[in-house]
Amino acid sequence: MKKAVIAVVFLAAGLWGAYGHPHVFMDTRIEAVYDGEGLRGFWITWRFDKVFTAGILMDFDGDKNERLSASEIAVIEDRAFSNLVNYRYFLYIHSAEGQYRPSSVESFTAYMEGGRVHYRFFVPYALAIGREEVKVNIAVYDETFFCDIGYFDSAPLLLPASDTFSGEYAIREDRGIHIDYTANDGSPGSTFPRQIALTLRRER
């Protein structure tokens, strides 16, 4: 098996947990969506590393043009994305309503940009915003550390322009969660997932 496609095979087969150090590297961007009552959900964008990108193109870019057609995207969704429902798409959302881990997502697509494959999908998450501030914490991580998931350096969270709602966010480590792993040289290590702490309010 060619090295470039190993990550794709693991994604499709669901073999996380057998390895103690990352095999897939990805950055996340989160875009909040409002409706008339408050928060409607989040668009999630993942940007993958070059090795994973090469595997996706090798296995699923049938015409080898480094662009993904609708039919190719459908196969990617089926064979290299749908299994992630078993990991709740690596998403942990906390608010006063409790913890939410999505069991389904909507509007999946995949595309190439800057030489990297990107996944994009929508996570419905309805939360009313009234007179009091609403706080939502969003974390994206793989507790097995097969995937090393970070955030975009530029604009990791996007808030839509709105005359009704406003908000701000900060990114911080969640010291309550400890992920142990084994480095490539065999030495032990540990890390803490980073979460986006989002505060939303109604302006009128």
Q: Where do the language-model regions lie?
A:
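Sec-dependent N-terminal signal peptides
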Residues: 4-13
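Intrinsically disordered, low-complexity terminal tails/loops enriched in metal-binding residues
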Residues: 29-35, 62, 66-67, 190-202
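Mature, soluble, non-transmembrane domains
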Residues: 96-204
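A short beta-turn/strand-edge loop motif at beta-sheet boundaries
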Residues: 38, 85, 128-132
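Early extracytoplasmic/domain-onset interaction patches
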Residues: 22-47
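Sec/Tat signal peptide C-region and signal peptidase I cleavage site
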Residues: 15-20
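Structured domain cores in non-transmembrane regions
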Residues: 51-127
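Short, hydrophobic/aromatic beta-strand segments
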Residues: 41, 54-58, 131-137
